[in-house]
């Protein structure tokens, strides 16, 4: 078994960190030695608002209060009741919270955390963000490709992946898609180990797992800690078979420390304070009972036999108990010993504060874009039946619509029906684009985690998703539908007009998809952008339909057309189809008689009734409007993504 000072382990970390940009010699030494994380008098405050929307009041709440401790290589557990303190402490140590509310010092081997500490340490969130539509190896290759510098050879990356697969006993499952909770958890850990960072944070890694799977995960973490890694994780009431593997234990409640030290000394610490521990009791349950005020002790002898019947009294009792336990720990010899070590580590570092909020990437934009597109296409292939069903429905619907309009003839009485077909094409592009709002919503948590961990920049993710998701799922179905309908219906058969129509359909589809994207990028639920976009398109399509029969918008509502995406697309399709058409052939006396009292005989007449300019600009102005609308909406989408990444860090 490798020791904590194993030169092989340190050399592997050095090879990786030498390739990191903006990493100086001091940072290299800090991160390649046995990583000892110390935190000194840290407090964390959050500002919350309450009240009515226009009369909200802001309150500052102290979530962590004057916490100090040290985490050495090994298994460092953070336990506590369900009040959010343990996960908050973990996130603060991992630099995954807004640093503006943080006070105190957090050091690595006695030096301030690097500004890009989030990118030079591993973090496994409580809710797994593994892509379940690709294999375990594909997930690891994605992590290695984006988090390791391009200067590292492909063979070296493959070697690291194979080592991690063997370490976590994933060799047999490497070509399986991670669907089970246990496999997803191990895959999440493996993705962090590929980078060989010396510190790994895990937020409740055993949540939702059975005892056997929990034991397997903890044993995996223990094997990693024996390699010299510092494993820091939060956990809730583990069994003794799990607890016995812990090297360090930190008990927190109400934002205060109840105990911090060797895990095996915790029972003796509370025994010496007067708490009676029964041999058959689980240590983790015993600690939480003490924190929750469930045990009488020498500090509470005057309250023996008292029954708390009300919730408020129970809450007040717990608050008093945690306060007493925190004071007891602050006056204990254990804290004095820890304080002496912390003071020695701190030295003069109080003058060198680091915000630890910078996110750096070790790969260039094009490299990130390529891998995001490849991963998106693999994800796309992971839903084959969805693709097949969508294709079948598109073909059937297009064939039905084309057949229904197959009766179109080049005469005057078919003008409105021809325009109705183009209106139906416009409706299809708009309605099918509504679901585009889910593109950035369903991957929101994964995006936050991967971006914060240094996988890619926001720009790479943005353009990669647009190219890999919208083209196969939005543009191709729209193009296929329009192509089949156009050919079967037998409208204006000209190569120039055909390709112009396809170009118009693509621009319209992308512009229509940009609207739900701009709304969905800032939302947590798919229902919100779907509802808003549906209302918008129904409203705008209604007015576009009125213009088909009345010739123009209602005078008092004419301004609406300037904000209507369907309006611009429909007008462009009309211009392309009707310009140069003659619906009253002079050599067909039967059709001439049918057109005797009919007003419209040429396509130009119909376009003029619709208020469409007959010049080339009358066509291209609609394209320009659609492109400008698309650019504005996609810009809003990008800004939304930039804002989202700053709201909550993962």
Swiss-Prot record:
Tissue: Highest levels of expression in thymus and spleen. Detected in lung and small intestine.
Molecular function per GO: ABC-type transporter activity; ATP binding; ATP hydrolysis activity
Transmembrane in keyword set: yes
SUPFAM superfamilies in the cross-refs: P-loop containing nucleoside triphosphate hydrolases
Subcellular localization, as worded in the UniProt entry: Membrane
Pfam families, A to Z: ABC2_membrane, ABC2_membrane_7, ABC_tran
UniProt similarity note: Belongs to the ABC transporter superfamily. ABCG family. Eye pigment precursor importer (TC 3.A.1.204) subfamily.
Protein name from the UniProt record: ATP-binding cassette sub-family G member 3
Residues passing through the membrane, by range: 388-408, 421-441, 470-490, 499-519, 528-548, 624-644
Domain ABC transmembrane type-2: 381-644
Record membrane topology: Multi-pass membrane protein
Membrane among keywords: yes
Quaternary organization: May dimerize with another subunit to form a functional transporter.
Name of the gene: Abcg3
Extracellular side: 409-420, 491-498, 549-623
Topological domain spans for side Cytoplasmic: 1-387, 442-469, 520-527, 645-648
CC terms in the record's Gene Ontology section: membrane
Gene3D superfamilies (alphabetical): P-loop containing nucleotide triphosphate hydrolases (3.40.50.300)
């Amino acid at each position: 078994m490798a020791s904590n000072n194993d030169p092989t382990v340190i050399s592997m970390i050095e090879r990786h960190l030498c390739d990191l940009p903006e990493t100086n010699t001091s940072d290299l030494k800090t991160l390649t030695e046995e990583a000892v994380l110390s935190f000194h008098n840290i407090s964390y405050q959050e500002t919350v608002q309450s009240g009515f929307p226009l009369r909200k009041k802001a309150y500052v709440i102290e979530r962590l209060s004057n916490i100090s401790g040290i985490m050495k290589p090994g298994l460092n557990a953070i336990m506590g009741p369900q009040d959010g303190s343990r996960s908050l402490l973990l996130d603060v140590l991992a630099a995954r919270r807004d640093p503006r509310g943080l006070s105190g010092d957090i050091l690595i081997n006695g030096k301030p955390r690097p500004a890009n500490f989030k990118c030079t340490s591993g973090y496994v969130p409580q809710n797994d963000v593994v892509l379940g539509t690709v294999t375990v190896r594909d997930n690891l290759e994605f992590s290695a490709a984006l988090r390791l510098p391009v200067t590292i050879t492909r063979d070296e990356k493959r070697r690291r992946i194979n080592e991690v697969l063997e370490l976590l006993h994933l060799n047999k499952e490497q070509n399986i898609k991670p669907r089970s909770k246990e496999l997803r958890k191990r895959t999440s850990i493996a993705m962090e180990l590929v980078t060989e960072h010396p510190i790994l944070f895990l937020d409740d890694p055993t949540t939702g797992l059975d005892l056997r799977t929990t034991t397997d995960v903890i044993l995996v973490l223990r094997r990693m800690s024996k390699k010299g890694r510092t494993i820091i994780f939060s956990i809730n009431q583990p069994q003794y078979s799990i607890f016995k593997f812990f090297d360090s234990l930190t008990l927190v409640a109400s934002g205060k420390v109840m105990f911090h030290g060797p895990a095996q000394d915790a029972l003796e610490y509370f025994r010496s304070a007067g708490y009676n521990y029964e041999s058959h009791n689980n240590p983790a349950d015993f600690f939480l009972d003490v924190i929750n005020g469930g045990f009488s002790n020498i500090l509470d002898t005057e309250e023996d036999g008292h029954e708390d019947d009300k919730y408020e009294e129970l809450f007040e009792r717990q608050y008093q108990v945690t306060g007493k336990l925190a004071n007891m720990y602050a006056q204990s010899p254990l804290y004095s010993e820890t304080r002496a070590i912390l003071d020695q580590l701190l030295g003069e570092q109080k003058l060198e504060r680091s915000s630890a909020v910078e996110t750096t990437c070790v790969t260039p934009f094009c490299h990130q874009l390529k891998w995001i597109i490849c991963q998106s296409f693999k994800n796309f292939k992971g839903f084959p039946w969805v693709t097949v069903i969508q294709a079948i429905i598109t073909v059937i619907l297009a064939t039905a619509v084309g057949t229904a309009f197959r009766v179109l003839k080049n005469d005057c009485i078919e003008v409105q029906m021809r325009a109705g077909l183009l209106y139906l094409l416009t409706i299809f592009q708009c309605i099918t684009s509504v679901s585009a709002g889910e593109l950035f919503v369903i991957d929101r948590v994964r995006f936050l985690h991967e971006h914060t961990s240094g996988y890619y920049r926001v720009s790479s993710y943005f353009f990669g998703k647009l190219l890999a998701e919208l083209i196969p799922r939005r543009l191709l179905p729209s193009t296929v539908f329009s192509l089949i309908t156009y050919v079967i219906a037998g409208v204006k058969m000209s190569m120039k007009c055909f390709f112009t129509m396809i170009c118009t359909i693509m621009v319209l589809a992308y512009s229509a998809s940009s609207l739900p994207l701009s709304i969905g990028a800032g939302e947590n639920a798919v229902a919100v952008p779907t509802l808003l976009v549906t209302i918008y398109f129904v409203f705008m399509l209604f007015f576009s339909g009125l213009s088909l029969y009345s010739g123009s918008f209602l005078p008092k509502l004419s301004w609406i057309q300037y904000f209507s995406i369907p309006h611009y697309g429909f007008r462009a399709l009309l211009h392309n189809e009707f310009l140069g058409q003659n619906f009253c052939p002079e050599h067909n006396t039967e059709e001439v008689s049918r057109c005797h009292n009919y007003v419209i005989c040429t396509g130009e007449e119909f376009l003029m009734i619709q208020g469409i300019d007959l010049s080339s600009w009358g066509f291209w102005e609609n394209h320009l409007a659609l492109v400008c609308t698309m650019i504005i909406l996609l810009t809003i989408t990008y800004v939304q993504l930039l804002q989202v990444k700053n709201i909550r860090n993962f």
